[in-house]
Amino acid sequence: MSAPGEPGAAPAPAAVPPPGDAALEARGLTKRYRGGQLAVDRLDLRVPRGSVFGFLGPNGSGKTTTIRMAMGLIEPTSGTVEVLGEPMPRGVRRVLPRVGALIEGPALYGFLSGRDNLVRFDAADPTADPRTRAARVGAALDRVGLVAAAGKKARAYSLGMKQRLGLAAALLRPRELLVLDEPTNGLDPQGMREIRTLVRELAADGTTVFLSSHLLDEIEQVCTHAAVMAQGRLLVQGTVAELAGRAASARGRLAVTTPDPADAVRILKEHGVTDLVAAVDRVTGELPGRDAPDLADLNAALVGAGVRVRAFGRERVSLEDAFVALTGEGFDVAG
């Protein structure tokens, strides 16, 4: 564990990302621990500048190991990773002043207050002007909602409060890149919403945010781009809209709102719709992958059979649908 900002049969690999202006770029990045455990396997990843990038996968999929290599905390077995155009870990001294990071939870001095912890972190930055330290610390506390608890000893903080304090430490100075590993871990729903709002504000100010999470809701609500890992390998990456769009064509789920669900089920079944689920006033089903009926013709068939159609169309595809369709695996959804 380190303080914020401190150095310290599987699917085929995803396609190598194209060159360009990236805040973080990995090529063939691999980490094998002693004993042969392969934690990250030939990872090719590109995080565009200005994006809010969601790094998604089940616990143990290699996300944190990837972040630790990117931040220079551990060396890769093979492959390369660049952060803000600098090779890591060689460029760590040039890169870290431009990066805020919260990895595996903050390392705090339990005997110090929240405010004094931030003072210590700020004093450790050789570029920080001591004359404006108090203002920076106060602004960081205010931004994460810890002003009222600033005088309390850190050991008395809840897990969620410690997460907030670690995030405040990462925000003591303006950063080009903010790396957050499970930033809402331990927070209540209100705290989660506040952190997500803060991430959006930082992105609006021009900060690239790299957000690791196992919560689909978290990625879907705040991210512009996403990548998903499983068992140390990258399965897919792209914009959130692209991933959802790919799943939409794969799933083809139809939804009909009607007060006549039984009749709707009968007609839809006759036209090849499968996996039909009927509720009080709604029917959903899967359109066939091949020779699917035209949606307009299907709607006309329902109306022609006397079914009162109130709404008709494809369901909105969530990021959960996208990743299940693309990877065949589920993730935690609630956030």
Q: PLM features: residue spans?
A:
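C-terminal coupling/interaction segments
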Residues: 2-9, 290-335
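ABC-family P-loop ATPase nucleotide-binding domain
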Residues: 1-32, 329-335
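ABC transporter nucleotide-binding domain
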Residues: 196-289
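A generic structural signal for secondary-structure junctions
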Residues: 100, 123-126, 245-249, 269, ...
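Residue-level "edge-of-site" marker
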Residues: 154, 281, 315
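ABC transporter nucleotide-binding domains
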Residues: 21-26, 31-230, 236
